[in-house]
Amino acid sequence: MPSYSRCVESLPRSALALTALFESIKGKCTGLSVADSTPIAVCDNLRIRRHKVFDGIAERGKTSTGWFFGFKLHVIINHLGEILSFRLTPGNTDDRKPLPELIKDLSGCLYADKGYLSASLKQQLKTMGINLITNIKHEFRTNKKTLYF
């Protein structure tokens, strides 16, 4: 069994093999899909300056829980939990940016969180036959005024 440092050193070389594995186990589009992203930190924030394995590839990113240094894994799954498409991007990539590339072979409804909310993206996906369903951010809600007596 290889040591941790040897395993970390081999990660960049194994990216192609992992991509081929994921491509071979992809599921079929069922009309109901879910999009999300998750951070993949490659080192602790205190060690960013000393990190050399993914130097020039990994970037600093921010999530709802704080800052990290590494990558973002963007995944779209169907309602059965099968992976339909995925991309690995630097940590500073906006969630909305890789979405048009991820949905090339999809149709139907795509559920996503607030990170994917954009009027222009929703319109772009609608022209491609995909209905993007997201939560409503507070800025986009209509102000409902009520009278209190």
Model regions: which residues?
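Short alpha-helical elements
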Residues: 1-149
